[in-house]
C-alpha cells in the first residue's frame, strides 16, 4: 500500500515492483471467457483442424483439461517484410489464436502443434513480475515444459531452416 500511495501522490515516477507484480497477478485471475462469441471461433482450416490438434495435445501433455478455446486469426497471406506472429494467448478470454498463415501444407503438422502447445504453456506457466519489477513471459518453468514437446527440436530446426522463407512472405 505504501508503494501505491507514493506512486499516486507523485512521489515515485515509476511503479514499484510490488505494484507491477500485484497487477500482473490480478490480471491472470480475470476470466472473461464467458464473453466469447463461440460461433465466431474458427477451428477448421483448409489443412489443419485446430480443435482436434488442441484436444490431442491436451490429452498427451496435461493431466487435466485446460479449458481453453482456440481459433484462427489473420489473413492467409501477408506483406513482405512484416513481422509474423504465429500464435497468441489472450489470458482473460482463455483464448489461443493461431495465425491463419500456418493453415498451409508448407508448415508441417508438428510445427503447427508446437505453436499450439507453446500457447497452451502461457496458461500453464503464466507471466510473472520479479522482485526487480521485470516481467517474465517465458519463465524457466515455461522453457523446461516447452522442451518436453516431443517435436521440440524438429520445430526449432524447421524454423532455422525456413527463416528466409518466413521473412520473404512467399508462402
Mark where each language-model region is:
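Active-site-proximal or metal-binding-adjacent scaffold patches in catalytic folds
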Residues: 1-113, 123-171
Amino acid at each position: 500500500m505504501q508503494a501505491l500511495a507514493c506512486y499516486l501522490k507523485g512521489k515515485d515516477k515509476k511503479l514499484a515492483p510490488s505494484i507491477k507484480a500485484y497487477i500482473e497477478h490480478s490480471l491472470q485471475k480475470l476470466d472473461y471467457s464467458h464473453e466469447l462469441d463461440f460461433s465466431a471461433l474458427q477451428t477448421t482450416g483448409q489443412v489443419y483442424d485446430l480443435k482436434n490438434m488442441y484436444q490431442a495435445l491436451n490429452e498427451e501433455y496435461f493431466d487435466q483439461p485446460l479449458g481453453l478455446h482456440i481459433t484462427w486469426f489473420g489473413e492467409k497471406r501477408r506483406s513482405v517484410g512484416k513481422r509474423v506472429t504465429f500464435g497468441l494467448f489472450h489470458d482473460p478470454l482463455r483464448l489461443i489464436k493461431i495465425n491463419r498463415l500456418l493453415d498451409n501444407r508448407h508448415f508441417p503438422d508438428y510445427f503447427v502443434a508446437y505453436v499450439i502447445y507453446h500457447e497452451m504453456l502461457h496458461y500453464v506457466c503464466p507471466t510473472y513480475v520479479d522482485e526487480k519489477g521485470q516481467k517474465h513471459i517465458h519463465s524457466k518453468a515455461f522453457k523446461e515444459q516447452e522442451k518436453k514437446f516431443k517435436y521440440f527440436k524438429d520445430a526449432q530446426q524447421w524454423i532455422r531452416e525456413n527463416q528466409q522463407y518466413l521473412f520473404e512472405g512467399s508462402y
